[in-house]
Every structure is written in C-alpha cells, then in structure tokens.
Amino acid sequence: MLHNAGLTLSDGTTLDDLINRDMNEVSLRVMNDKELYELEMERVFARTWLLLGHESEIPKAGDYVMRDMAEDNVIVSRDRSGEIHVMLNVCPHRGMKVCTAEAGNAHAHRCIYHGWAFRADGSFIGAPIEKEQMHGNKRSKDEMGLKKARVHLYGGLIFATWNKDLSFEDYLGDAKFYLDQLFCRTDNGLEMLGPPQRFVLPCNWKIPGEQSGSDGFHTLTLHRSLMEGGIMGGTAESIYDTAPGMYGVDLSVPQGHTLRCLEAAQTFKMFADVSFEGKSTEERLHLLPPPGITKELIPQLFKNLSEDQVKQLANIPPQVGGMFPNILIAFIFAPRTDGGASGALSLHTYVPKGPDKVEFVNFIFAEKDAPEDVKRDMLQNAIWSTGTSGTIEQDDADTWPQIMRNSRGHMSKTVTLKYQALHGHERPEGWVGGGDLYPGFTKDDTQWAWWMAYYNLMAEA
C-alpha cells in the first residue's frame, strides 16, 4: 500500500487515510475539515502561483485593485515606471488594512489608523510628524514596507506567489505549450471586459476546484438544459446524443493543470454542415476560428505561435480545463450566423474564504485587437453561459453547496469519492505537446491528477 507520513491531523488521521492512492478514492471529510483547511493555506496557497487579474485592469501609473490570495487581502498596483506589484494589504504598524477601496488610482496608500504611508511599490514613505520618528529606530525605513509577493505576467494575466523558490516556468511545466495557444496568440493579447463578477457560495474551495480538473462527464447530466435548448448539439430525449462531443484528448501535468482538447471538426458539425476533410490548417481556422479570433487576426496566430501550436488550434484545440489549484479555463466556441467571430473567454478563480465558503470570481476576456461589436458579443456570451447567473453556473452553484451540506454528516464523512473510471496514459500518433494524455471519452484521469498534485503539496511539511 502506498504511504506517506507527511501529514497527520490531531486525531491521528493521516493524508493517506483521506486520499487512498491504491483505490483512487478521496474521503468526503476533506471537504469539511477546519484543521485540514488551515494546512491548505500554508501548504497549497502559500506555495503556488495564484491568478489575481489582468494588466488591462490597471493600465495607468497609480492604478490599483484589491484582490485575495486565499484569505490574504492584497493590493495589486502599477508604479510610475509601469511595473506591477502585489503587496499584502496589512499595515506593519498595527495590522490595519492600508487600502480599503476595491479599485482606484493612488501613488501612495495611507493607513487610516495611524497614517503610515506606502508607495505604489509597497515601500514605506513615513508616518505623520516625521521629526518624532513614529516608526521608531529598531528597524530602518527600508524594512517597514508592505510584505510583497513575487509577480509574473503571463499573456497579461497577473500571477503572484509567496513562494521564493518556485519559478513560473516550473509551475506551468508542459502545460505551457497548450496555454500559450489560449493566452499568448495575438500581438496585443487579451483584455478584460470590465471588472470581474464575484459572488460567495457556501462550499469548500476544493469542490469546484477538483471539477475544474477537466471534469467533462458531468456536462451530460448536470448541464442537460444546454441540450434541451439545442446549445450542445444534442437532444433532450437522450443524453447519449451528445456523446460524440465528449470524445477528444484530455491531458494533465504533474503540477495539476489539466485541459480537454476537442476535435474542431466535431465542434464544427454542431454549427454547420461542412466537412473539414482535406482542408489546410489555415482553411480550417477560417472555417472555425478559435473563440474571439476574427479572420483578420488569424495571421497573428502564425506569427505568435509555433507551427505545431497553430496546427493544434486548427485541429484539436484546448477548450476547457484548469490551472492548479483554483482556476477554471473556459474557451467556448459560439460562431455567429453571419460567419463572424464570437465565443466566450472566461477564467474563474475559486478563492477560499473558510472551510465552508468560497468566493467565485469570473474574469471575462476578448482579444484586445478585436472589433468592439465582437467584444460586446463575447461579453454577452460569457455572462449568459459562464457568468454568475449563466446557464452553466446556475447548475454548478446549486450542486456544490449540496455536496458541502452532505460533508457535515457523521456517516457522510465515511463516504469516499470515486475516481476509478481511468483511461490510462496513451499518446496519440503524431501528438507533439507534452503531458500525460488520455484520448477517447472523458474519464476521471485528469481529476485524479488534480488530487495527486494536491496530495504532493500537502505531504510536504
């Protein structure tokens, strides 16, 4: 039996009691345990890279937004030189919030408690009555700044971490080949379409978190209304009518990132009765452009991506998935009837707010160089589908809290979650990208890979 002694709770329960790697089962208790949650804050959220927003939210010097790295509130700001900083929103004097506004523009942030002031890069300016030196003489002013996280911009997305050692390249791993196709494909990249949508759900962050590990199977049942409306190409009479759309190549990497790559030809059949057979890469891209890409932007794909990446976008593009630990990726095809570009580009983050509470944050994007009518169309599509009251998220927002309620019961905690429908690794012929690959019908492989990434971090003391 596989065993790791890296974590033992106060009642003697070990990590291996909670996550059975031999049976591919996870105890329902993990969704409702305060002690485990506190360890997650230290071992998962303080050790990995977290998505906070996009640089288009703070275009000018002094612009800032407030975000959360798990339960730590941070200021995301741009200084006079244009550099972006992420600072803990805790005054080192008495622990008060330095910034209390959700967003704004300020070249200095002043704590309302005792007036300590800090620059946009987090460095300490001083306290009122400078001659009295109210910061004392035990520490230099250079030591009095706000605690700073490391920052990395990826396709304009703002990531931050408290971990001094983990590089962003190591965090992405082999997933970069695929994620570049979504975030780094045009000259000027993506931009956010307004501030993110946010709402709080009464559930543990891991419930939506593990679903973001490319759980495609739940779509057939939970999101049946999409079929009833003819949106997914199936019919209400039989969920199996949509099964062909569930076939593709799922993939995972050891870091816990997962993606579902679906045949563009199969997707195209849902919208038009035209064959992809014999079409070149460029012809396929013109028939079914990636979500948000206009025909005028297609040449930029060849400029910014490798030949292999462009071929994948044309043939079997990544569409949905997740970045560990708490990001959902949704790049949804929705071609317009006039042949124009459209779709929906959304990223969700599931921010922990306690063992039984999560903040759902929905970031909506479009290509910066897309026409305004395309941006409006994509904003509407994203709100309608993956928005806080969208057709998809209404279903999820009802299901996740019910799992949470079940996790509180004495007997319910003895139930284990099953991840035993496994395909196993198999590399399709001619596949170029890295990672562990699972071709065929979507199964449990990628979600189990998510749990293994979680297990490995939690096992490290």
Task: Indicate where each model-derived feature is located.
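C-terminal catalytic domain of Rieske-type non-heme iron oxygenases
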Residues: 77, 83, 89, 149-461
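A short, Trp-centered hydrophobic/proline-enriched beta-strand micro-motif
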Residues: 47-53, 223
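Generic structural signal for secondary-structure transition and capping sites
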Residues: 45-49, 96, 217
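Generic alpha-helix structural propensity
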Residues: 31-35, 47, 69, 86, ...
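Rieske [2Fe-2S] iron-sulfur-binding domain
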Residues: 57-177
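Short N-terminal helix-initiation segments at or just after the protein's N-terminus
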Residues: 10-20, 96-103, 285-297
